[in-house]
Amino acid sequence: MFMGEYHHNLDSKGRLIIPAKFRVEIGDKMIFTRGMEGCIFGYPIEEWQKIEAKLAKLPLTKRSARKFTRLFYSGAMESEFDKQGRVNLTMTLKEHAALIKECVIVGVSNRIEIWSAERWNDFSEEANENYDDIAEDLDDIEL
């Protein structure tokens, strides 16, 4: 399980360090793809395979299913960590998440999310203001 918030910068070659705590659970490589709300999703291989199985069941007759899978898979890449625990994300993913220098890596249960620091700050500020309302909307899970 991934949790926590970590701040790292892209290096001069555009590589990003993935926190050691996350790498222990991930292994030597993971899959990155376009995430929601302008971030990048990162999945361990086992989690990615579960998602692939679910997406394979979507009906090709549904336009939204076709659009989503095209975007989700076309933005995906497999990346191995180098000896320092860095990954080199594609330009497509960096542009999707507006990654320039300062990044925030967030653990979200079965995945990690990579955000530009600016987008993360905007998201967190807005979400924190509405935290109680968001929790109330999820009352059926009984936390």
UniProtKB/Swiss-Prot annotation:
Disulfide bonds, paired cysteine numbers: none
Which key words are in the record?
Answer: Cytoplasm, DNA-binding, Repeat, Transcription, Transcription regulation
Instruction: Say which domain of life the source belongs to.
Output: Bacteria
Q: Which PROSITE patterns has this protein been placed in?
A: SPOVT_ABRB
Which Pfam families has this protein been placed in? MraZ
Q: Where in the cell is it found?
A: Cytoplasm, Nucleoid
> Record's Gene Ontology CC terms?
cytoplasm; nucleoid
Q: Name one GO molecular function term.
A: DNA-binding transcription factor activity
Q: Keyword DNA-binding on this protein?
A: yes
Q: Where is the SpoVT-AbrB domain?
A: 5-47, 76-119
Could you mention a single GO BP entry for this protein? negative regulation of DNA-templated transcription initiation
The entry sums up its family as follows:
Belongs to the MraZ family.
**NCBIfam families xref list:** division/cell wall cluster transcriptional repressor MraZ (TIGR00242)
Q: How does it assemble?
A: Forms oligomers.
Name under which the protein is recorded: Transcriptional regulator MraZ
The organism named in the record is Lactobacillus johnsonii (strain CNCM I-12250 / La1 / NCC 533)
